[in-house]
């Protein structure tokens, strides 16, 4: 990917599979503002976010859920739901080496991108489309949705919901939560400033500025 004078590392892509196709996209800023209509649009925008070419909440993701199919994510890669039963039966007859990790529209971030200078204790809890700045640590109970993430070093032991941004040197304690925009009728995008702490099992439905502390167990 090459975008806004930045680009990912160059890699040559070769495949022996005749049913695979390498797709080249040539987008302008207008494409970023347009709703998502195809799977290609969806994956490209998610890659732009996770490669940190664009910040969360700055590109149009309308139509994302409609465009993405539900996929069986396995240790052998993505498999169509229509094919998984046959593949599982074949696996059991052979070495039984196929197992399912999830049934979801979104893959794990690390299936496609390895973020630089970031720790992720449980890769299944960070979706493709997450924006993780260098120095971020996601512990086992931490979760980061797509179109959300960190803007600096952060310790994440709670949930970063879709649309939420966490400032530099902030800490989300174990079991803490931030209200996203995907459910509950919330249209307000939540952000947390720098040097903030959400105590264990706390939560917020409002944005916080810098140097804020929310007591453990308290929901605001």
Give residue spans per PLM region.
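Terminal amphipathic alpha-helical/low-complexity segments used for targeting or macromolecular assembly
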Residues: 1-111
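Acidic-glycine-rich active-site phosphate/pyrophosphate-binding loop
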Residues: 112-116
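A structural motif detector for beta-strand N-caps
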Residues: 118, 124-126, 130-132, 136-138, ...
């Amino acid at each position: 990917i090459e975008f806004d004078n930045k680009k990912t590392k160059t890699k040559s892509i070769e495949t022996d599979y005749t049913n695979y196709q390498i797709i080249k996209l040539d987008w302008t800023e207008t494409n970023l503002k347009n709703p998502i209509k195809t799977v290609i649009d969806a994956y490209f925008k998610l890659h732009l976010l996770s490669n940190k070419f664009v910040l969360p909440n700055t590109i149009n993701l309308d139509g994302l859920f409609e465009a993405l199919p539900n996929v069986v994510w396995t240790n052998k890669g993505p498999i169509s739901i229509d094919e998984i039963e046959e593949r599982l039966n074949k696996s059991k007859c052979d070495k039984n080496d196929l197992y399912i990790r999830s049934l979801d529209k979104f893959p794990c971030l690390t299936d496609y991108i390895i973020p630089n200078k970031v720790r992720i204790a449980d890769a299944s809890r960070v979706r493709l489309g997450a924006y993780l700045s260098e120095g971020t640590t996601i512990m086992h109970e931490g979760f980061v949705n797509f179109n959300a993430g960190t803007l600096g070093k952060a310790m994440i032991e709670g949930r970063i919901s879709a649309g939420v941004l966490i400032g530099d040197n902030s800490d989300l304690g174990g079991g803490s939560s931030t209200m996203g925009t995907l459910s509950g009728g919330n249209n307000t995008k939540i952000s947390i400033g720098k040097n903030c702490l959400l105590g264990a099992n706390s939560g917020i439905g409002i944005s916080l500025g810098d140097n804020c502390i929310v007591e453990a167990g308290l929901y605001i």
